[in-house]
């Protein structure tokens, strides 16, 4: 039991730290499962699905006041209505492709080799974008032009490849389309809510036969750790990238991906 609790804490930290950073939570969880020797058990696969809800609730908690104002204004405030429509438009491409090709992607791309290569390539792209002399024209995540929301949603589809990073794809897409760093990161958080809830419900339904109450304590620990860690990380992340950009996270990706490839090549 103690070893399972330790694994739950580690995976909860990995999920909470990486979910909203441009480093790929799915990729890190896959590597953690591989190198911590969790085995190919149905429980641990289900566990990594369930703890995502902790990270989702962290965003809802942090942005509750703003999201509540938007919800109240959905039927009377044009700005709130436009933002809600924008989020739905951005969510749509991933929902469609996920429904059509999600099974294929998980069957053929969810392996450590793909993750490591994706981490390295994504890190190189993040380094490149961070060095560009971009001139932002959008500084408010809730007021992007409607076509911009759609293009960001299309960029998010790249994150279906494990190791690419959902937040990384949406942040890079938003910045190239004119958003400043803070607005790009904030919209990535907002878009995470329907995207992650949709993925959570879909995966939960597909794996419903493996969900039992036998490991409820382990799941509760992972959930709580993910929630608390995500809150700390999101608050720190916005302040950091506003001042320093994404270079640290780009090198993080490259280093983790390279070390992963070396370990895989050595048969670890």
UniProtKB/Swiss-Prot annotation:
The keyword Signal does not apply. It is an enzyme of class 3 (hydrolase). Keywords: Antibiotic resistance, Cell inner membrane, Cell membrane, Cell shape, Cell wall biogenesis/degradation, Hydrolase, Membrane, Peptidoglycan synthesis, Transmembrane, Transmembrane helix. It is found in: Cell inner membrane. Its main location: membrane. It holds the Pfam family BacA. One of its GO terms (cellular component) is plasma membrane. It is a multi-pass membrane protein. The keyword Transcription regulation does not apply. The chain crosses the membrane at residues 47-67, 83-103, 109-129, 144-164, 184-204, 217-237, 246-266. Its EC number is 3.6.1.27. One of its GO terms (biological process) is peptidoglycan biosynthetic process. One of its GO terms (molecular function) is undecaprenyl-diphosphatase activity. Catalyzes the dephosphorylation of undecaprenyl diphosphate (UPP). Confers resistance to bacitracin. Bacitracin is thought to be involved in the inhibition of peptidoglycan synthesis by sequestering undecaprenyl diphosphate, thereby reducing the pool of lipid carrier available. This is Undecaprenyl-diphosphatase. It comes from Rhodopseudomonas palustris (strain BisB18). The lineage of its organism: Bacteria, Pseudomonadati, Pseudomonadota, Alphaproteobacteria, Hyphomicrobiales. The gene is uppP.
């Amino acid at each position: 039991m103690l070893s399972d609790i330790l694994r739950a804490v580690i995976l909860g930290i990995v999920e909470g730290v990486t979910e909203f950073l441009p480093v790929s939570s799915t990729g890190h969880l896959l590597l953690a499962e591989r190198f911590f020797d969790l085995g190919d058990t149905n429980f641990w696969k289900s566990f990594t699905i369930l703890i995502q809800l902790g990270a989702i609730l962290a965003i809802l908690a942090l942005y509750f006041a703003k999201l509540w104002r938007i919800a109240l204004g959905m039927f009377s405030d044009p700005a709130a209505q436009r933002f809600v429509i924008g989020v739905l438009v951005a969510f749509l491409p991933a929902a469609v492709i996920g429904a059509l090709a999600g099974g294929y992607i998980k069957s053929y791309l969810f392996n450590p080799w793909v993750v490591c290569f994706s981490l390295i390539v994504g890190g190189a792209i993040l380094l490149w974008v961070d060095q560009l002399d971009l001139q932002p024209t959008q500084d408010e995540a809730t007021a992007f032009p409607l076509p911009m929301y759609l293009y960001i949603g299309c960029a998010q589809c790249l994150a279906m490849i494990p190791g690419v990073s959902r937040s990384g794809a949406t942040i890079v897409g938003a910045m190239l389309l004119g958003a400043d760093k803070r607005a790009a990161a904030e919209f990535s958080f907002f878009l995470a809510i329907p995207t992650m809830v949709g993925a959570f419900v879909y995966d939960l339904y597909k794996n419903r036969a493996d969900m039992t109450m036998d490991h409820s304590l382990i799941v509760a620990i992972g959930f709580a750790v993910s929630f608390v860690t995500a809150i700390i990380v999101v608050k720190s992340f916005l302040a950091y990238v506003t001042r320093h950009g994404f270079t640290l996270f780009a090198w993080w990706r490259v280093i983790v991906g390279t070390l992963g490839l070396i370990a895989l090549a050595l048969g670890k």
